Amino acid sequence: MKRIAIDAMGGDNAPKAIVEGVNQAIEAFSDIEIQLYGDQTKINSYLIQSDRVAIIHTDEKIMSDDEPAKAVRRKKKASMVLAAKAVKEGKADAIISAGNTGALLAVGLFVVGRIKGVDRPGLLSTIPTVTGLGFDMLDLGANAENTAKHLHQYAILGSFYAKNVRGIANPRVGLLNNGTEETKGDPLRKATYELLTADNTISFVGNVEARELMSGVADVIVSDGFTGNAVLKSIEGTAISIMGQLKQIINSGGIKTKIGASLLKSSLYEMRKTLDYSSAGGAVLFGLKAPVVKSHGSSDVKAIFSTIKQVRTMLDTNVVGQLVEEFAKETQVND
């Protein structure tokens, strides 16, 4: 049985969306147990009772505007902190939260702990593409500054995730840069390019420009955390703007526009589904001793269900256990 600890109080739509997502997951998957951390009365308002769902009551929670490290130190009984402690103590196998990203990164690093040999765990997310296959990108903001060695490790981590969780046999790795030529970029990008080219354990396809990302040019995209976070938010904002503009044009158009939209209804639905990140799951802080997954702050029921499904797959494939073994080998070789 896969045991998943969930911060029921994190996110804009908590606890309603969190608990209703859990209800759907419990019905869909018979091999999971959920531990919900948070206000018992509020959780029970939405929970469909099940012997595979336990509520661990706490009144304390980390707010979205709390200073992450300080909040984790001071709020020892916060729902997010208790969920992370359950993982550390072996009472749960993974943690999910839609709450304060910085705080989740802090509990991931200082409570769950990083895998030996991983210098800087990266925030990884699967981003939809027009091909429908998506790509894994990291780092998406766990680290504001990175070295070439960090980015090289992200390529290894991303490839490992793509192989073991998404089932891609030989994932193509691209380095996000301001041009495709190998001479492009700042010193960080140039140094990273050399490391990736020299590593024959990954399938490096070279530099990739931001405009190529949505076309599926690579299965894994490597970036420093600052740039990756900016690109992710740009993609999300563009997708929301496109769908919003289409809706506005259809609603404000005449009868011909509405007839045309009706004829294109199925195509527009497919387009919306392609751009919908809520079905892709959450962002994984990859490189830790257990799955620590950040669901979007505005996650709805569908997004929470998708994140639980994602974590279930991670536990089913034992991707973290395999990663520990992989880096143990690397450490022995380097020693």
UniProtKB/Swiss-Prot annotation:
Q: What's the Enzyme Commission number for this chain? A: 2.3.1.274
The protein's UniProt keywords, in alphabetical order, are:
Cytoplasm, Lipid biosynthesis, Lipid metabolism, Phospholipid biosynthesis, Phospholipid metabolism, Transferase
* One Pfam entry name: FA_synthesis
Q: Which InterPro entries match?
A: FA_synthesis (IPR003664), Phospholipid_synth_PlsX-like (IPR012281)
**Can you list the GO cellular component terms from the UniProt entry?**
cytoplasm
Q: Where, per UniProt, does this protein localize?
A: Cytoplasm
Please name the GO terms that the record assigns under molecular function. phosphate:acyl-[acyl carrier protein] acyltransferase activity
Q: Which reaction does it catalyse?
A: a fatty acyl-[ACP] + phosphate = an acyl phosphate + holo-[ACP]
Give any single GO term for biological process.
fatty acid biosynthetic process
Q: Which pathway? A: Lipid metabolism; phospholipid metabolism
Tagged with keyword Lipid biosynthesis: yes
Which branch of life, at top level?
Answer: Bacteria
Subunit field text:
Homodimer. Probably interacts with PlsY.
The Swiss-Prot or TrEMBL record describes its family as follows:
Belongs to the PlsX family.
Annotated NCBIfam families: plsX (TIGR00182)
Q: What is this protein called?
A: Phosphate acyltransferase
State which gene encodes it: plsX
